[in-house]
Curated annotation (Swiss-Prot):
The record marks H155, Q384 as: Interaction with tRNA. Residues 189-191, 344-345 are annotated as: Interaction with tRNA. It is found in: Cytoplasm. It comes from Prochlorococcus marinus (strain NATL1A). It catalyses: S-sulfanyl-L-cysteinyl-[protein] + uridine(34) in tRNA + AH2 + ATP = 2-thiouridine(34) in tRNA + L-cysteinyl-[protein] + A + AMP + diphosphate + H(+). One of its GO terms (cellular component) is cytoplasm. Keywords: ATP-binding, Cytoplasm, Disulfide bond, Nucleotide-binding, RNA-binding, Transferase, tRNA processing, tRNA-binding. This is tRNA-specific 2-thiouridylase MnmA.
Length: 404
């Protein structure tokens, strides 16, 4: 029995060693940038942003907290998040600022999401919110408060700045130095997929202190710091779904139901639906159709108010068009390159060939590209992001287009 107890205690100590070493490395890296620098931390009221603020304080930064008020009511983006964020700032002894961003959130996110569903696409509000609301609002606030130099958030991603020296021999380059975005070390929590659209100006002023940590280490460190949010449950849903109860509840509140047809790829009508906004590519459940084989949504035709379905084996595609591209770690390529493409959050990046499509009206810049996958992909969904990787580096990304 004593041996078992000793073994358990030994394992407990050993399990904590990587945590200590990783956090020490993170603190040293933060300290090399600190000096007399100031930073504002985007605080959501969750454990990730709370530990971000705590680590920066410990590393010697002059820290202030900022929370965006995005929606009225309860939830992480609403009053609950504001209260928890204020509590963390009080605990850490730092200033807390609240920015009323409800109007821009309505315009850039809610209106855009609803428009997308009406057009038969599946919007990706998180990446749009990061670029057009969260980081842009924080940058705007920083510029108005000239004593603040940097922005920090609790995202699980990493940045290599243009003045840092790293081995990047495998990255295509034309000699122009860029701030580079990388996956977070914790691949189970990596959020780089949602950050592909951040411009260079924002990346150059942003810090991701949790980029080298795992979620488990974050929890351990939050408990060590006795942070009030250390045991707060993680949000499992989009903020819109959390706020309204579900995405369907959100959609039903704003978009009217409109009866339409469910058809096979041949055009044969096999059922009906109450609104294309309730469907997404790849969906199998909730079709309300009994068929000899399982059917999946393969296309949504907004012009005809139709949902097209097919067996899984008939729904794979080997290519797609990606539009509205933001190039991150490299300049826009001038010729085809081999990449790995991630077409959904948490999905595995797959090998593909990226062929630039040049716009003669925009100085032959590559805002679109043609993606040829090495193997057929299931559920290539218009409106979702296709993010291009080379190893851990985010080369760029854009939105999957309906046009092909």
């Amino acid at each position: 029995m004593p041996m078992n107890v000793e073994t358990r205690e030994t394992k407990k100590v050993l399990n904590h060693l990587p945590s200590e070493e990783t956090v020490e490395k993170t603190l040293k890296r933060l300290q090399t940038f600190s000096g007399d620098q100031s930073v504002v931390v985007g605080l959501s009221g969750g454990v990730d942003s709370s530990l971000t603020a705590a680590l920066l304080c410990k590393a010697g930064w002059d820290v202030e907290g900022l929370t965006l008020w995005l929606m009225k009511g309860k939830g992480s983006c609403c009053s609950d998040g504001l209260v928890d964020a204020a509590g963390i700032c009080d605990q850490l002894g730092i200033k807390h600022h609240i920015v009323d961003s409800k109007e821009i959130f309505q315009k850039e996110i809610i209106n855009n999401v609803l428009k997308g569903y009406e057009e038969g696409i599946t919007p990706l509000p998180c990446s749009r919110c990061n670029k057009s609301v969260k980081f842009s609002e924080m940058l705007k606030w920083v510029k108005e408060n000239k004593n603040i130099e940097k922005i920090a958030t609790g995202h699980y991603a990493r940045i290599r700045y243009s003045n840092e020296s790293f081995n990047e021999n495998d990255l295509p380059s034309n000699g122009i130095k860029r701030h580079k975005l990388l996956r977070g070390k914790d691949l189970n929590k990596d959020q780089s997929y949602f950050l592909y659209d951040l411009p260079q100006e924002i990346l150059g002023r942003t810090i991701f202190p949790l980029g080298e940590l795992t979620k488990e280490i974050t929890r351990i460190e939050a408990l060590k710091h006795s942070l009030k949010t250390a045991k707060k449950p993680e949000s499992q849903d989009l903020c819109l779904a959390e706020h309204y109860g579900s995405m369907n509840a959100f959609i039903d509140k704003y978009l009217p139901q409109k009866k339409g047809e469910v058809v096979l790829k041949s055009g044969q009508i096999i059922g009906s639906h109450n609104g294309i906004q309730h469907f997404t590519i790849g969906q199998r459940k909730g079709l309300g159709i009994a068929w000899e084989v399982p059917l999946h949504v393969v296309e949504i035709d907004a012009s005809l108010n139709r949902v097209i379905v097919a067996p899984r084996e008939d729904s794979g595609k080997s290519e797609c068009i990606v539009k509205d591209i933001n190039w991150v770690s490299i300049e826009a390529p001038q010729e085809p390159i081999k990449v790995e493409v991630q077409i959904r959050y948490r999905s595995k990046a797959v090998k593909a060939k990226l062929i630039p499509i040049f716009d003669s009206n925009k100085e032959n810049y590559c805002y679109q590209c043609h993606i040829h996958f090495e193997e057929d992909q299931f559920s290539i969904t218009p409106g979702q992001a296709a993010v291009f990787y080379m190893g851990d580096y985010v080369l760029g990304g854009g939105l999957i287009s309906k046009e092909y």
